[in-house]
Amino acid sequence: MRFSKFYAPTTKEAPKDASLPSHIFLVRGGFVEQIGSGLYNFLPLGKMMLDKITKVVKEEMDAAGVLEVSFSVVTSGELWKQSGRFNVFGKELLRFKDRKENDFVLSPTNEEAAVALVRGKVTSYKQLPLNIYQINTKFRDEARPRFGLLRGREFTMKDAYSFHANEADMKREFDLMEATYSKIFTRLGLNFRAVEADSGAIGGSGSKEFMVLAKNGEDDILCCDSCKYAANVEAAKRAKKTSDAPAPQADATKFYTPDAKTIKAVAEFFKVDEFYTIKAVIKKAIYEDTQKIVAFFVRGNDELQETKAQNACGALELVDASEDEVAAAGLVAGFCGPVGLSGVDFYIDNELKGQTQMICGANEKDYHFVGVSVSSFNDERFKDLVSVQAGDICPKCGGKLELSKGIEVGHIFQLGYKYSSAMGATFLDENGKARPFLMGCYGIGVSRLIAVMVEASHDDRGCVWKKECTPFECEIVISNLKDEAGVKFATKLYENLRNLGLCVLLDDRNERFGVKMNDFELLGFPYAIIVGKGLENGEVELITRDGLVKEVVKKDEILSVLKEKLC
């Protein structure tokens, strides 16, 4: 492609609301153009990136035996009502009515459409397993669209849905998709980790996120320094915490503890380590048609992980409870404990199960129990509630967990029966009995990947694309268009590189050399060949964008050098 015939409107001005490098450089480089809140046009460079990523995703999904389909972007609201998500999903789901007052949605995800596609048509276990995918436009009405392509309202996504007769088959497909995703992100040149994750609004029993490590990452992930264990903080686990500190010596005795409302005050009052105290966190749980006060209990030197807590009580949302709401529920703020607690729902962290010699509130102002055994509660009271921290012990190998920042680029789920049961989608098993499908779903943020690549690889001058996925593998810059020999050599090199199957940009614009170099640094293609005065001595300059490393190469050798680097 000749730059003189190309459209890449670069600018020095960053978007006013941009804070992340990907947002700044993709707009400044003319990859995308913002046309509204969270809405972007893809210009030629952006569309080239979108197509290249799509090609890799499609090739690997096809190789895994997944069948491509295309769902309508607009989905019937009736399908979402059948699944139960029409009202539950929240304002992110854009709902609208047609002229006949029928409900429709702009799809942020397509579980309902996928179930409707097979319901009544896939009728026998002999037709299973089945895995279908699409690469299509999605819409999510984000409350605060920001960060450019990382948090837009309209986006391109690859979403796949699998249907199975049994759990073993569902697990095999889940593992196949995990391996397929790893191939995709490896081909795209990304430094990523597959991490255990919360299933969120999609639902299901098990999920993994694929996180690209980046210092500007929006998610906190914990990775073991000794094995492959990694998890989002919302789902992270650890080996059970222990302590060598002496335990309090008492036998479920009630003590007067005036004004000891905090864990620190209680530990100081009894001169014990906070490890032996139990902390109460009181929240208001919001459900579809009601709300109530819920108490969560964790170890005194731990913190509550709110996503885990929300999953434990099945709430749509957890918010802080006011003092009046706490009192109205019959709870005593600062002195709340699980022993003898009644009238409210409560949950206890798994690590406290069976613990002895603990200190907790006595549900009476200015009183605590000492020497409590956390063993007399029903199993359903115990949930994973703790917020795992850096330095905690890996649950797999005993190594230490380290905190990293990551950006989610993919998510795979074992959905189970959630959607098929709700929507009445069944098949006949080997015994002729009707059973709901087991399902999996698998998503990749295709347009988001463009921004993620920039976040993972850039400097203060612009993008630094990896050769595995870039709009152009190299750029040839003619420093002086009046130099006929230079123009002739550059044009011949351009044609030879294209004949090798490379995507090359020939900068033949009538612009100052400084403008051309600034654009090269901003656009970030892996290599630039500068055809200038050195040509008189039989030399050209090769610049590697990553680090802006410069080297002089004989003009007769530049083709073979680039062939070695890029082919």
Swiss-Prot record:
InterPro entries given for it? aa-tRNA-synt_IIb (IPR002314), aa-tRNA-synth_II (IPR006195), aa-tRNA-synth_II/BPL/LPL (IPR045864), Anticodon-bd (IPR004154), Anticodon-bd_dom_sf (IPR036621), Pro-tRNA-ligase_IIa (IPR002316), Pro-tRNA-synth_IIa_bac-type (IPR004500), Pro-tRNA-Synthase_IIa_type1 (IPR023717)
Question: What general EC class does the enzyme of this chain belong to?
Answer: ligase
Which key words tag this protein in UniProt?
Aminoacyl-tRNA synthetase, ATP-binding, Cytoplasm, Ligase, Nucleotide-binding, Protein biosynthesis
What EC numbers are recorded for this enzyme?
A: 6.1.1.15
| Any Pfam family the entry gives | HGTP_anticodon
PROSITE patterns tied to this protein: AA_TRNA_LIGASE_II
Q: Which reaction does it catalyse?
A: tRNA(Pro) + L-proline + ATP = L-prolyl-tRNA(Pro) + AMP + diphosphate
Q: What is its main location?
A: cytoplasm
Q: Where, subcellularly, is it found? A: Cytoplasm
Q: Which GO terms describe its biological process?
A: prolyl-tRNA aminoacylation
Return one GO MF term.
Answer: ATP binding
Q: Which GO terms describe its cellular component?
A: cytosol
Domain commentary: Consists of three domains: the N-terminal catalytic domain, the editing domain and the C-terminal anticodon-binding domain.
* Family in the record: Belongs to the class-II aminoacyl-tRNA synthetase family. ProS type 1 subfamily.
Q: Which HAMAP family match?
A: Pro_tRNA_synth_type1
- Subunit record text: Homodimer.
Question: According to its UniProt entry, what is the function of this protein?
Answer: Catalyzes the attachment of proline to tRNA(Pro) in a two-step reaction: proline is first activated by ATP to form Pro-AMP and then transferred to the acceptor end of tRNA(Pro). As ProRS can inadvertently accommodate and process non-cognate amino acids such as alanine and cysteine, to avoid such errors it has two additional distinct editing activities against alanine. One activity is designated as 'pretransfer' editing and involves the tRNA(Pro)-independent hydrolysis of activated Ala-AMP.
Under what name is this protein listed? Proline--tRNA ligase
Its source organism is: Campylobacter curvus (strain 525.92)
Gene name linked to the record? proS
